[in-house]
Amino acid sequence: MKPFGYSYLLDMYKCRVGAADDLELHYRFLEKIVDEIGMTRMSQPTVIHAPTSYGVELYPEKAGVSGWIPLIESGIQIHSLEPTRFITLDVYSCNKFDINIVKNFAKKYFEFEHCSEHYIERGVGFDNK
């Protein structure tokens, strides 16, 4: 049975200094990764400094950026922690995509030293006729 969708989870460690707190870098990454993997945007990315509540920083030790871009095929989200230079990326799509393209593109943008990754077939019991 064909899966409903596919998730690729990429955890990036020891990213380039400043990358995990760079709002514009995250925005450009989300905007361009869509084309790299052949997906279709539903809107422009939403990217914010986090964690904040109406502009007030709540947890300085977790300072960073969170972002999301909705896709016709599903969505991509990213979260980062500047104090530890850690960035997480989740790509979810109803269509198959090349995870090596995602990983290499992320490496170019965030210059991580090492990473961990998981690829998951979602909805394997879904009757996708």
Task: Go through each PLM region and give its residues.
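Polybasic/polar functional segments that serve as interface/processing modules
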Residues: 1-129
